[in-house]
Amino acid sequence: MNMLALTIILPLIGFVLLAFSRGRWSENVSAIVGVGSVGLAALVTAFIGVDFFANGEQTYSQPLWTWMSVGDFNIGFNLVLDGLSLTMLSVVTGVGFLIHMYASWYMRGEEGYSRFFAYTNLFIASMVVLVLADNLLLMYLGWEGVGLCSYLLIGFYYTDPKNGAAAMKAFVVTRVGDVFLAFALFILYNELGTLNFREMVELAPAHFADGNNMLMWATLMLLGGAVGKSAQLPLQTWLADAMAGPTPVSALIHAATMVTAGVYLIARTHGLFLMTPEVLHLVGIVGAVTLLLAGFAALVQTDIKRVLAYSTMSQIGYMFLALGVQAWDAAIFHLMTHAFFKALLFLASGSVILACHHEQNIFKMGGLRKSIPLVYLCFLVGGAALSALPLVTAGFFSKDEILAGAMANGHINLMVAGLVGAFMTSLYTFRMIFIVFHGKEQIHAHAVKGVTHSLPLIVLLILSTFVGALIVPPLQGVLPQTTELAHGSMLTLEITSGVVAVVGILLAAWLWLGKRTLVTSIANSAPGRLLGTWWYNAWGFDWLYDKVFVKPFLGIAWLLKRDPLNSMMNIPAVLSRFAGKGLLLSENGYLRWYVASMSIGAVVVLALLMVLR
């Protein structure tokens, strides 16, 4: 257990070494340092896990030093290990190591090879700080760290202005959520005098027993932070554009780890949310709406990575739904299995993109199953897990637990939303697979091979099957137990969800394996074009936010750039200057001008006297 800090220190050392190498190292040396540091962190995590189970799954705390101490305000840099943080740590370092190994192959020949691994090592260190922190402020440090790394990696190919814009968009939108999280910190410390997770849960019931509604505001702010980082409604607009980064980044940050940080935040502060059931129910509604909207958006995308981005948004929606119906174990279980099959799909999509000479439009591909059979198998298994194909995939078991939790706790409407989402998931997933790997070959794909390419894919492929579902997160005693569904009802639900998934796959085969005449006619109809455009543009949220927030903000910025306050202060000076110029013109030395001026002045004075009388 004393090795807990090494899971942060090792990737941090890798970051420092790679950063100071300034690209002078060869790709092999950079890969050894970048991949090796994360691999060692994963190995340390394995030792920690063995020790954790050997000691009866007891919560362990490792104080490192006092971070801040001002009067009564004391924040320690303390790490905590329990079943929840161990699960997250295993996902971050384990799946992270596999993705780093794959990236050492994928990024070969790219400019900034060592810079890439420096950023990803810093990300792993920040993510580990986030999941091991024993207090909200230390978690916030890791939270901001992963946000910075996300920005750097989305804009990795910074010479293209579009990538820079995508990075800035992700940074700004997620910062909105971070502001909400900061407000939550202020409220909770002001009310409870501590930010330690355990102490907050212990003090909250007595402190808020008198009906103080500040706890509701605090949990709403926590939810605001969670939806920003986890790309949920209404702060979901950044994730699809984040696909501008290298594909291993999409797998590491925007599928398996960082985007699930919001789920972890709510799970870690579950004691506070249980005291505000209205906010907890809102969490479930946010998840249900997001999973449906993202599912329809994924159905019409043409970019292979954007399909997977919207599917990520949708699957995190399932996790939020699970949290909202108090199916805590199911949420974390799905977080883990999702990391397996979504990392597999993203890495396999990277192989497709390289094999097709960096083409990402699925309609310009086709017939690739013969050229890259291993990648095709990865897509089949990963797609089946994403679609929750019954019995043989990890996704089936975790998603069914979520639906069972919703049904057992009386949230039938959310369960129905989950079933509709399951149908949409299987439909858009196998639409992508059938278009890319079946039909007529439209592009000559070259073979992709190599140990560092194939080994991570094979490991993730195995974990995406029912084998991954055998890994049960040790959450007993950390999160409240989920209400269990009666055996008969559970069997009915499993059959129903299985049928829904299979029907979605069969419908996808009928629509996209043949000549696609029906799909074409629907797409070319007036309603089809309207809905297709609407869904393709993610329900118009970007357009709405541009009109409501971006354009007014830019208008205000344009106005402030010209310093209106200073201009107003100059008005008296300008008027005085014009008056002075007028008086100078009147002093011209002509007698007739003076007589005329006096006459006009006299007439004006007489007129005023007559009017005022």
UniProtKB/Swiss-Prot annotation:
Any Gene Ontology biological process: ATP synthesis coupled electron transport
A molecular function (GO) term: quinone binding
Protein's name in the database: NADH-quinone oxidoreductase subunit L
Main location: membrane
Coiled coil: none
Source organism of the structure: Escherichia coli (strain K12)
Cellular component, GO, one term: NADH dehydrogenase complex
Family, similarity comment: Belongs to the complex I subunit 5 family.
Periplasmic topology ranges: 1-6, 53-74, 134-210, 268-281, 326-338, 398-413, 473-494, 608-613
Annotated membrane topology: Multi-pass membrane protein
Keywords per UniProt: Cell inner membrane, Cell membrane, Membrane, NAD, Quinone, Translocase, Transmembrane, Transmembrane helix, Ubiquinone
